[in-house]
Amino acid sequence: MQAHPSVAVLAAMLAAMTGKPAEAERWTGIAERGATSSSAPDGSPTTEPWLALLRALLCRDGPDQMLADAELAARTMAAGSFFQAAATLCLAMAHLMAGHRDRADLLFEDQVAQGRMVGGMIGACLALTERALLAIGRGAWEQAGRYLDQARSVAQEAHLEEYPPVAVMHAAAAQVALHQGDQAQVRAELTWAQRLRPHVTYAIPYFAVQVRVELARCYLALLDTAAARTLLREADEILRRRPDLGIFVLQVEDLRAELAQVKDKSIPGASALTAAELRLLPLLSTHLSLPEIGQEMFLSRNTIKSQAYSIYRKLGVSSRSQAVTHAAQLGLLER
């Protein structure tokens, strides 16, 4: 595969976007070792623009390096490359993390146009969502709603509903629904985000932290402190691996301070299920025993048993079958 670094880059990107960090790192290593001066499939003179874009996507060294990598990718890849829109999205996210909100917003706007032109619908959906979050930050709720309507339309058109990064769209939509007083829609958006959250990992760390920050904001507004605390713990775990994420680090700290001011009266429920527990939940509906599930997930029997009992407790049930039934009723599992 080192003889085909472009294929390795694509494999690394797919692994990252679907929440598989170890696989993404493995393919990235193969791509880097196989880097050649031969042209890339999009007509770029070498594979370096693709590698630069991959490094930007993974953001292993913070927003400054991400910005440099994204600029290199955008500057050196072939004109009209189908990856130009992806490079613009990475540029926008790097500027956002650096606190350059206005610049980021303009780049997100450019990305939507580029993404639609080349069929990069996931990028367009994410860019529209980021514009919605920036609008929320300005208090422009109606504008945020319009951006989210467009993002949802793109997601539905391209069948992206089950794609992990779309979790951030649901987190933003939950906030808009909460502002509008639509409790049923709030619950629906939070449930969708919860189903996708386990697969939004440190493979793409800025999205992983952002999803948890935006969900924590919503749960905190609902006074569900147990859920907010769970999300901030997960954000901390990601930041231990990728500590340099600009404004997202500050947002986690601000939310933690806000959470400390709230009297903790909420009892951990389904909303407080951890990402690990949400990953286990679908396997509880299979014929596999807990030890067999442990083998499937490369976890010890004790770890799986502990996670399963934690799920039962948070769902308020006493058995595996009851947990599966109740999770399906909540929308966390397919019926």
Residue locations for each model-derived region?
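Inter-repeat boundary and helix-capping residues of tandem alpha-helical solenoids
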Residues: 1, 41, 45, 81-83, ...
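Conserved positions within tetratricopeptide repeat
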Residues: 5, 25, 67-68, 105, ...
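Tandem amphipathic alpha-helical repeat scaffolds
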Residues: 5-21, 46-63, 82-100, 123-139, ...
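Helix-turn-helix repeat elements of alpha-solenoid scaffolds
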Residues: 19-34, 59-72, 99-110, 141-150, ...
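Amphipathic alpha-helical segments of tetratricopeptide repeats
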Residues: 29-40, 70-79, 109-120, 149-159, ...
